[in-house]
Amino acid sequence: MAKEDTGVTAPKKPETAQVANINGIDKLEPPKTKEETESSKSVSSEKAAHASDESFKRSIHEASYVGWKQIGGWEDKDELTLDDELMDMTRETFLDNIIPDSLYGDWYHSVAIFFIGGVASFALGHYKFSMGSAFFVIVITSLLYRTSAKKYRGSIRELVQKEFTVQKVENDYESLEWLNAFLDKYWPILEPSVSQLIVQQANEQMATNEAIPKFITQLWIDELTLGVKPPRVDLVKTFQNTASDVVVMDWGISFTPHDLCDMSAKQVRNYVNELAVVKAKIFGITIPVSVSDIAFKAHARVKFKLMTPFPHVETVNIQLLKVPDFDFVATLFGRSIFNWEILAIPGLMTLIQKMAKKYMGPILLPPFSLQLNIPQLLSGSNLSIGILEITVKNAKGLKRTSSILNESIDPYLSFEFNDISIAKTRTVRDTLNPVWDETLYVLLNSFTDPLTISVYDKRAKLKDKVLGRIQYNLNTLHDKTTQRNLKAQFLRNSKPVGELTFDLRFFPTLEEKKLPDGSVEELPDLNTGIAKVVVEEGSRFAEEEQKVTAYVEVYLNAKLVLTTGKATDTGTLKWNSDYEAVIADRRKTRYKFVVKDGKGEEIGSTIQTLNDLIDRSQVNKNLIPLKNQKGDIKITTYWRPVRLEIGSNSVAYTPPIGAIRVFIEKANDLRNLEKFGTIDPYCKVLVNGLSKGRTDFKSQTLNPVWNQVIYVAVTSPNQRITLQCMDVETVNKDRSLGEFNVNVQDLFKKDENDKYEETIDEKAKVGRLVMPKKKPKGTITYYTSFYPALPVLTLEEIQDLDKVNKKKKALELRKSAIDEKKISKEDKAKFDQEWNEVKELEDMYSNRQKLDLPELLQYNQGVLAVTVLNGELPDSGLYVQAFFDDNGHPRFVSPRIPSRIVKNGWSGDVIIKELDKSITTFRVAKNKNYNRVEKCVCEVELPTQELVKNCYYKPSILHLSGEGSAKLMLQISWFPIDTKQLPANDLITNSGDLTIMSRSAENLIASDLNGYSDPYLKYYINNEEDCAYKTKVVKKTLNPKWNDEGTIQINNRLNDVLRIKVMDWDSTSADDTIGTAEIPLNKVKVEGTTELDVPVEGLENAGQDGGMLHLAFSFKPRYTISVSKREKKVGDIASKGLGTGLKAGTTVIGGGVGAIGKIKKGVFGGLGSLTNHKKNHEMGEEETKF
């Protein structure tokens, strides 16, 4: 669109012109086409894209004048000198020397002058003088008034100066003149940039805002300045004797324009007041409206609630002690000679002040205040601060109203915030002493709004009658979150009409916390919380260029909870409606979105589980296709966990769709955070920000090689998988080296039966590590694969399905008995809701199999879900860790348990590769980061298969023993993975104990002068410098026979290489290496003995024949642990390796899973006892009895 000619010529810009460059884009250049313009970060790309399509005819208009310099026409020559600033504003006039001082200069003198001028004009007219004679009266009156008014303004300035000079009566207010002086100096410098930013943002929004009527073809700010005079802080008062974590302050703030009277033209160009000119183009006519000389004065009270963690301020309460005094000049048609002052309308200013008091009163005026939750605002979620649990017990002594219609009282309670009902109890029939015993959960946005509890009488054909109300102050819940057996009086006409007994509990929203290194602390994976669903927009509902009118109905678990407004357009329809709800069971919560046209006919619909909606928002896949490809709808979902104490629902596990295998090979060029030395890096895998597994750390390196596999369970294809590199810290928290999100969308493929397929991606991928506010540095090389889970029903879902089938039969019977003509609309809507809920649940469970436990146990690979319901620990402040198979680090860890009794449970999962050989270990530790070999308080170890058998159908108690004893109540679920076998690298046959039988050698190289050697062998694993095992020495021979045997630990048989050094023993000097050999350990068979003849290569030249070694190997598979115990030292970490192997004849210490032979009582309560096990667990040979 061409730039509009407003008929006003902009003045020449000064050399210091304001630059409108935001994020590399000049916002004041003429608007470009959609293809040329890149979206601003302040507006979504969708909004920017639609700004130029057919439905958005407005363009972003350029402002004519911005900033005080452009508004005032200031140029460099107008800079005030010292003489200009000292110019006398009370310059005398001719009449000052003639008229006595007592006859002019006060307000009543001005009244007298106008009175005399009026009388003189009347006299001239009465005596038939000509019109010209009135000119002399006007001149004389004007001169007298100018002289008197000028003196009067001078006297006012002197009075103000006197007020500043005289010492005030003592008070406890303080001034902030240092801040005012700072603003006076820098405000004229900052104001042009601030005004420019306001204009850019406002004009951009007004060009894309659909709420503006279509007949307004353009709307923009044409001129804007905040003036050269900044706001002032007039007074500050800090209250004493408040709590240590509470700060209360009074602030007086004012904003007053300059008095431009008696100033010279040069001074006026330097003292510019506030001005805003907004122009609207309506039917081709440009209409300007200007607002200038804005003045206000406010007195506010601010309360800060402090806390220890960042941002250190928990809440801020703002209260205006009175309605602010404000004034302004508003004119229609701008500053032209035809302008019309809007406030000249009689009574308009009074009306504005009254309306301000009416609408500000319930929010900002005493006793109310506006509460801001700072952590919530910083998180950007804009959700409620928590959930309020209301347990209504009973009411006593309700009194009837005087109405003659009250034959019986059927009371129920309604809970309200700001006259909006948020929850209701059931109705109790015909009683004045109702008992409800009902628990309700409501969203709480602020502690400052009182909770209104109204008791109503339910009436069939009349409106329900209010019997009484309670206004309950919730401020006490901030410090005391649980309040039992509260009693409050219902009031009617300020008289008690009954008493209510109830309980209140507040559960706060759990927010993410940023750590000093920029990383975000993990939130617990809870099943309860707050969900906010925003229906933003929709598209493709009709053919191109066809105008569509549509709205959306949102159903939560088959109940209609939101109906958006109607939107009409030819392209994208925008609704931007949201619904926030308390979620008691996230995994079972589902939303149905139905798009209907203007006539109420359905266009399309989609059913999404809450988990899927959350995952879509995590990976920015918010556009959801409707059924039968009838369009798309954009849904954004916000989720915050809340730890509700409602039993196992809060920690219930969501069934997975499969497992992703992440093979983490290595990292290169990592960031070194150490001032001295080098980092000790490891890698974590996170799912939606929650840690699900990690590698071992590699000591002192920037280029670690891990070659470790981590499996993570996923519940939808839209979950966010993240690889994060960390540096080990023994004293403080581990530090982040960067992270990146893994693209796994290509792994999820379905067959013709709509079931997920196994996908193995053998191509190596490289991801660059990114840190907040730092340049990317370092890469990780990894591989990914996907193994689908068998879709099976959980025990709870089987029970739910049985209930659904029973309910369906009951509804079918009711349907056959219903008379369509006699049924009311309410009853029909209720029946339709129940029927739709049954159909949705049937559809949700229709694609899953029902398998009993014996059938499930036929699958050897699967996802093991562990839910800890409650328990008892030996002490407070401990953590419960779970280890599986060869995990050196805990697969999942409980939150810190503040007391000995475990009240709040948790859940976790792990992929079991071989159920019949798997081992599970639970440990209670003082530090959540302790690994498998570090000290614990108590532990228990048992076969995973037995754990499934004993805890699948019902929870069982697990006993842990050691320095102390503990009990945990567990519930187990088993979800088979639909694959024949996982990669050999991940199985138990890839790790274990390698027994080396060094038998003999032939034709070794002579090293001594006598033509012989004193040979022995040294064995090394891969490139390790420490010897894993060495043989005895056989002296003076080239054909030794050792017949020696030793056992070493192998963590990766298929990829490890055994290096051999043939050594010559010397009594007087260091031993010499006379040859080397290598054996890939994948040549060693898992079963039986492997005989190998290994050629030796000499050191003098490549390929030199150094003889032949005759060796034999036997391998015993078992799960090994490659972690080491960390010791704290000054400035560094010293590690004691436990997985490097030992000399011949010794036993592997700490290498295998720990024994449970020390446990003398039953692992499961009331289920018997465990037999003793060997220290080195031999898979497949032990039996566990219950």
From Swiss-Prot:
Subcellular localization: Cell membrane; Endoplasmic reticulum membrane
Keyword Calcium recorded: yes
GO CC list: cell periphery; cortical endoplasmic reticulum; endoplasmic reticulum; endoplasmic reticulum membrane; mitochondrion; plasma membrane
Cytoplasmic membrane side: 1-106, 150-1186
Residues in coiled coil: 795-822
Membrane-topology descriptor: Multi-pass membrane protein
Binding site for Ca(2+) 2: 1008, 1064, 1066, 1072
InterPro entries with a match to the protein in the record: C2_dom (IPR000008), C2_domain_sf (IPR035892), C2A_Tricalbin (IPR037761), C2B_Tricalbin (IPR037765), C2C_Tricalbin (IPR037762), C2D_Tricalbin (IPR037756), SMP_LBD (IPR031468), TCB1-3_C2 (IPR056910)
Details of cofactor binding: Binds 3 Ca(2+) ions per subunit. The ions are bound to the C2 domains.
Extracellular side: 128
GO BP annotations listed: endoplasmic reticulum membrane organization; endoplasmic reticulum-plasma membrane tethering; ER to Golgi ceramide transport; phospholipid homeostasis; regulation of phosphatidylinositol dephosphorylation
Basic and acidic residues bias spans: 26-39
Parts of the chain that traverse the membrane: 107-127, 129-149
Keywords: Calcium, Calcium/phospholipid-binding, Cell membrane, Coiled coil, Endoplasmic reticulum, Lipid transport, Lipid-binding, Membrane, Metal-binding, Phosphoprotein, Repeat, Transmembrane, Transmembrane helix, Transport
Gene3D superfamilies for this protein: C2 domain
Chain intervals for the UniProt region annotation (Disordered): 1-50
Subunit description: Interacts with TCB2 via its C-terminal domain.
Known function: May play a role in membrane trafficking.
Extra remark: Present with 6140 molecules/cell in log phase SD medium.
Recorded family membership: Belongs to the tricalbin family.
Record comment regarding domains: The SMP-LTD domain is a barrel-like domain that can bind various types of glycerophospholipids in its interior and mediate their transfer between two adjacent bilayers. The C-terminal C2 domain shows Ca(2+)-dependent phospholipid binding. It binds to phosphatidylserine, phosphatidylinositol and various phosphoinositides. The other C2 domains do not retain all 5 conserved Asp residues found in calcium-binding C2 domains.
Name of the featured protein: Tricalbin-1
